[in-house]
Amino acid sequence: MEYVLATRDNFIEQIKKSDIIYIHGGETMNLINEIKKCADFALLVKGKVIAGESAGSYLLSSIFYSKTIGHLEEGLGILPIKVICHFAGLHVEKLDSIRGDLEKALLKDYQYKVYSL
């Protein structure tokens, strides 16, 4: 097994060659905006094991609420979920007000959910 840190210059080739992809937390909107530059990202990760933590989870979701951002935002929609990470019992009404067709994921710190597409 080889661990490779993604680079902007080789990102698409790195995704194509990878079986497992981990998307870290951090600056949510910067991460989403950078990944959106890769128009085929959803197709590139299809069939791969992909894990997202915090901002990475927001990126994969359809809708998310981040207390740092302070309002609802759209993820890439790779997972048909609406999510709050670092959930502490607040802001559920934000998710309840939109897209009743999506599963709601309220993830406390160190809590994870596994989905299969």
Which ranges hold each PLM region?
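Short intrinsically disordered, low-complexity coil segments enriched in acidic
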Residues: M1-V4, E103-A105
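Active-site-adjacent pocket-lining segments in enzyme domains
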Residues: I32-K36, F41-A51, G56-L117
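Flexible gly/pro-rich beta->alpha loop and the following alpha-helix that scaffold active-site loops
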Residues: E2-V49
